[in-house]
Amino acid sequence: MYEYKFDVRVGSKIINCRAFTLKEYLELITAKNNGSVEVIVKKLIKDCTNAKDLNRQESELLLIHLWAHSLGEVNHENSWKCTCGTEIPTHINLLHTQIDAPEDLWYTLGDIKIKFRYPKIFDDKNIAHMIVSCIETIHANGESIPVEDLNEKELEDLYSIITESDIVAIKDMLLKPTVYLAVPIKCPECGKTHAHVIRGLKEFFELL
């Protein structure tokens, strides 16, 4: 059976991919409609690519490229409504999708600094677990300690000083980078120009 194969660049990584099949596409649509996309998306990335150790935003970008190549919808047709009421046909090149630039993930708690990593795709379904699993190292008193070297009591002491407001701030920091696509639009009626931005996997799925 013929397989359409292609490469996708995600940051510094070159990922080998194959287009997903009609059966896999229909499974994705069904999962989207019944709210169970996590299992299917992870399966598509596993079965259709050789990607390893991607974070959330990298996996989202890979999925969008996989979708665009597989369905032949590199140029997706959509419409945008101008403030003057005009419906404007809009051509969206999904391969122009980008991800926000990564940042150094440091968070300060009193005299302690915590180094985080970005979460994996769908880790954000449980925020508390996501935050705990993304801790890499603790910096205190001039020492840098990998989280796996902390004993149970030390971990409990660390978790006990993380307040509700800290949880919100850390969550926002970890989930800030996402996929986005800016589409320049000019209204043929009123002449107004606008950059329509599609942001986050949820908004991209609305194009399906």
From Swiss-Prot:
Q: Which UniProt keywords apply?
A: Late protein, Viral release from host cell, Viral tail assembly, Virion
Question: What InterPro entries does this protein's entry cite?
Answer: Baseplate_phage_T4-like
Swiss-Prot/TrEMBL GO biological process terms: viral tail assembly
Quote the protein name from its UniProt record. Answer: Baseplate hub assembly protein gp26
This chain's function reads: Baseplate hub assembly chaperone involved in the tail assembly.
One GO cellular component this record assigns the protein to is: virion component
Gene designation per UniProt:
26
- Pfam families per the record? T4_baseplate
List locations, semicolon-separated: Virion
Propiece residues:
1-5
